[in-house]
């Protein structure tokens, strides 16, 4: 079938901000789709609220709207642009839900807009739990015994009939939001209440638990001619009961017999045909390990996280082809871009094994509930490719960047028996390491299978890895065993530990016997056809398929898995750097291991190496490619941390030298540089022991800001108000020693300002100055950033430009740098300098139209700013106002305190842009998922130090018609200021407490500032958690509350009577 010519303009709906369950895979899918549609000659309009994405670059679509993905704003765009069709299936759950809302509101009919890819009936059948169950029954496909419930009473009725455990699956939610496995009544009440609140249609499916069955996924494609094919099948190592996003996954499946594989394949194809999906679809199935019985768990009628994994695992570009199918092309008439000769209906064949391991953020959240279930908790993932399952697994383990270069974690090895058993029987994020520890202690694979239901095949492979470990230790420097270990995926670092030598000695031993990896191509066809894909993985075999080209090359190091503090912003910069290298006439090579991202799309770079970002793995690529140098500025802390080791091995680090990077990151060297440059910073010193830290804090006075050197995302950073709290921090949060010093600074509570700049060594370009709405003390990644700065005097701006220029030239920065300042009155202090790309670079690049990573890369390659057409100094400010608003995933991370501080907690961001600050903030808040009520009740419960400021906010809330509730202390302060307030009981008091009001939906906004002390049992923690669980916005900074108030005031009309003196209202009490 030829492509459709009756449609000209297509609206693509993006997935919005990065949250747990919906990450960079949709930037990858959306980018591919937009380019694919443009390639076919369509006019593409894109709406997405996330500025940190490649897909929101102006070149990706004919019209790019960075606006909230809400019914109101998308409707406005449709009425303005008049698209002929919308494509919602590449925007994750957000895209699907938006399409359903637009349809229900009558907008699609009103504007005559067609839905492409998957029609609304199919979306409803797949997403609505009841409709899906009915369809499966119609097809004769088994689903677990289940019931649709809309309230708790219906849940009780179901449980009385089938007993515990039961699984709760809310309808139309993302990443299992609000779902879980319930073993008792208490868990049922909590999970069902949460699930019904989070489901936009207030509907949950309760089903009989089939935990323990094998979980298998099929990624399938279908076109309008009813051609359907399987791109890839994947097997979860963890059985049913753990969300697939939190499971270790292998592709292709390893334990299915041919009969089982074909059985589940036929079911998947039958389902996609019955749903009449045109494009990609993910089918999740549960297989009884002891029979051929199976159940259909669910279907995602869209491109998903698994699609991104399947695309990278096979090389088959699902999103690109799904977009072509959506406009009428068929699988047998679209060429597979990997081979260039075969067509897209050929099912990919793999002659290698792929392992995916999720990456969690529990290093950030000590108090989080780490237990895994049906609600997703991972922020990102890594993928590795090998010739065997064990090789792929070990490569994936060292890609995680959790301080493990092997299946060996100190906590697991040192755990007592009770902890070991608990960690094995009740899975958490680190179960793999505890399984290895149990095998080392002599537990059998049969015992572990009985406890975990993990297939014996995988446990057997693990046990073989442990056996090989023992042989390595017993035979130091044995060449045969060394070769066997390398084929099995063992790292030099681990072998060095086993043989008590340094890593270099292992390398020398390998060099002596010419034991090096070769690189194999990912070609979708197991070498059956000629392929030109420049996509490689390493393995220890004979034939090398990657050859160095005659062109000079530059290697760019990626940023690895997405985690809090290092998100998609760094992948954005990596991709732009690659494009700039190509524009400058060099071959651009990427090394990265994240299957979700645009940078690991093989069509982006000249060559892609899908490898762990460790010194050993990166050096192997460098040895084969012999590049001009390596760029580390765009890969976040991951790449920066590799620079030292690479330089010591003679690799040229392009851009800022290692010595100058160290001067910016090492505290003592930085202080000396500031002294020479005569730039002030808050008083502080470096401490290398607990005693030293206490002495420094005593000298400069509390409160102090403490943090380790060389960190990203404010990890382990804290404001400490007493000696007792400092001792607790030094013993619990960091392992302080002379090699890992801790910085102790005077905490300045001023206005925080952030600057990104580019320096060529002589000239410094400052695209923009951003001010943070929250005062210093809240991590920059969690603050609302405003551009252009609204509250800075010309003198302060001039000082910032002067300091930035002096710092860039004084530290010999070549490329990008990010500086954070704190402004106290007219005084400006430097907090920190990061000699690399930052998370604000994509935001600033888009709004100033200065492609920062691109320009910085050209500078790194030796060009200067003036020749590139840029005038040094501060770029002219834009007339419009732009805000970057953080987005959090607290609903997924139970037990995590939502209060904001110096440690970063947000997973993503959105942008708001308009002609006034209030309008831009409104868009930012709405896009971030904050519900903006024009009237309602504000609950105020603030620390003593904030009470004076809270009085002014309360007056303003009262003026625009809000009712105010407060706890005793805050209420007394408000009453003294003659502000009408209802006093509510604190937690633990008799009668209705403020928690009851939150749960009953009687509160629309909570303002709760921290009393010091971080114990979660404190009242504040419970107030904040309850607010999040009940979908109520909660502000832990008065600055954020003031920003929301400004927006509400701008949307309100003041209502005052004409009487000269108003009678004061009586003070109400509740």
From Swiss-Prot:
UniProt note: domains: The large subunit is composed of 2 ATP-grasp domains that are involved in binding the 2 ATP molecules needed for carbamoyl phosphate synthesis. The N-terminal ATP-grasp domain (referred to as the carboxyphosphate synthetic component) catalyzes the ATP-dependent phosphorylation of hydrogencarbonate to carboxyphosphate and the subsequent nucleophilic attack by ammonia to form a carbamate intermediate.
Domain MGS-like: residue ranges: 930-1070
Protein's pathway: Amino-acid biosynthesis; L-arginine biosynthesis; carbamoyl phosphate from bicarbonate: step 1/1; Pyrimidine metabolism; UMP biosynthesis via de novo pathway; (S)-dihydroorotate from bicarbonate: step 1/3
SUPFAM superfamilies reported for this sequence: Carbamoyl phosphate synthetase, large subunit connection domain, Glutathione synthetase ATP-binding domain-like, Methylglyoxal synthase-like, PreATP-grasp domain
UniProt-annotated binding residues for Mg(2+) 1: 284, 298
EC number annotated for this UniProt entry: 6.3.4.16, 6.3.5.5
Note describing how the cofactor binds: Binds 4 Mg(2+) or Mn(2+) ions per subunit.
Residue numbers spanned by region Oligomerization domain: 402-546
UniProt subunit comment: Composed of two chains; the small (or glutamine) chain promotes the hydrolysis of glutamine to ammonia, which is used by the large (or ammonia) chain to synthesize carbamoyl phosphate. Tetramer of heterodimers (alpha,beta)4.
Residues that bind ATP 1: 129, 169, 175-176, 208, 210, 215, 241-243, 284, 298
Organism: Listeria monocytogenes serotype 4a (strain HCC23)
A Pfam family assignment: CPSase_L_D2
One GO term of the biological process aspect: L-arginine biosynthetic process
Region (Allosteric domain): 930-1070
Residues holding Mn(2+) 2: 298, 300
NCBIfam families: CPSaseII_lrg, PRK05294.1, PRK12815.1
Matching CDD domains: MGS_CPS_II
Residues binding ATP 2: 707, 746, 748, 752, 777-780, 820, 832
Residues covered by region (Carbamoyl phosphate synthetic domain): 547-929
SMART domains with a match to the protein in the record: CPSase_L_D3, MGS
Designated name of the protein: Carbamoyl phosphate synthase large chain
Keyword Ribonucleoprotein: no
Protein residues bound to Mn(2+) 4: 832, 834
The ATP-grasp domain, residue ranges: 133-327, 671-861
GO molecular function, one term: metal ion binding
